[in-house]
Regions:
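A polyanion-binding, active-site-adjacent surface
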Residues: 1-288
């Protein structure tokens, strides 16, 4: 008796009409807030596989959504004035698909504050707990340090334009008060929004507060902040000054480090055409 061919027991292929890709109008799931969810009840999967890979040091699988985002995107903003267009940009931040589909970012955007016609624009990295709760950039102790810096310059928040490089707080599993810096991908997705802000505000100088902001604006890679500060750079046809983030000043008592930040602020004031007194020039210098 001959041996017949073994039956094919492989499962049939799925129907052609079945697709794992979500519908175009599907939004990412609402993430729990610290007030609503105890830390032991947050499902890590709700933050997306990509974030788990980031936290575990694994490169995520590349998809169409991982394609490079052009730095120079032309947004169709409503309004005639810069203020109206900035308001339109604020609405776009909430609904723009590249940001909306980022599972590694939380749900609440934190846009800019201050004067949309300011000569000085300051850019910090991303919202943390305080910023997400209060809805403004640089809140909490870091914000208090910024306010003190501005007061020493003869300014207040209403005199500058303050914004984030990344407009959403980077997410973490079981996140309550802890924060994390934005990833390179989150910065890449967010950069066209910042560029549009700079083009609308048209400041005389942009101040990059911290290494992350500097890396995003200048595309400086792993160049340390110490090598970037002390001079002016150019990005988006605008002079850029790099200095330490106010949060750094909270962690150091070194007067020489504080003097470095103040020297940067003096250069920013000169670039913006602001008057500088002899008293201001002598701040944080050793007493004779």
């Amino acid at each position: 008796m001959g041996h017949g061919r073994a039956p094919d027991i492989r499962p049939p292929p799925p129907p052609a009409s079945v697709s794992a890709k979500p519908a175009a109008n599907e939004t990412r799931p609402k993430q729990p807030t610290p007030e609503q969810t105890p830390p032991d009840s947050v499902d890590e999967a709700s933050f997306g596989n990509e974030l788990r890979d980031i936290l575990n040091g694994v490169q995520p699988h590349k998809t169409e959504e991982d394609a490079p985002v052009p730095r120079h995107i032309s947004f169709d903003l409503e309004g005639e004035t810069e203020e109206e267009k900035l308001s339109s940009l604020r609405e776009l931040v909430v609904n723009w698909p590249p940001l909306r589909n980022m599972d590694s970012l939380r749900e609440t955007p934190v846009f800019s504050s201050g004067n949309p016609r300011a000569d000085i624009m300051m850019v910090t990295d991303a919202p943390g707990l305080y910023e997400e709760k209060q809805g403004v950039p640089l809140a909490g102790p870091s914000g208090q340090k910024l306010d003190a810096m501005l007061k020493a310059m003869g300014l207040s928040r209403s005199d500058i334009y303050l914004t984030h490089l990344v407009k959403y707080r980077p997410a973490l599993p079981r996140q309550l008060t802890n924060n994390r810096p934005p990833t390179d991908r989150e910065i890449e997705i967010s950069l066209p929004i910042l560029r549009e802000e700079i083009m609308l505000v048209r400041p005389k100088v942009v101040v990059a507060l911290g290494a992350i902001s500097a890396r995003g604006i200048l595309q400086s890679g792993e160049t340390p902040l110490s090598a970037l500060r002390g001079t002016f750079h150019t990005a988006f046809n605008t002079p850029v000054r790099v200095t330490y983030n106010p949060s750094y000043l909270l962690r150091t008592e070194d007067i020489s480090e504080k003097r470095k930040v103040w020297e940067d602020m003096l250069c920013v004031m000169e670039q913006a055409g602001l008057p500088i007194s002899e008293k201001q020039r002598s701040y944080f210098l050793p007493k004779k």
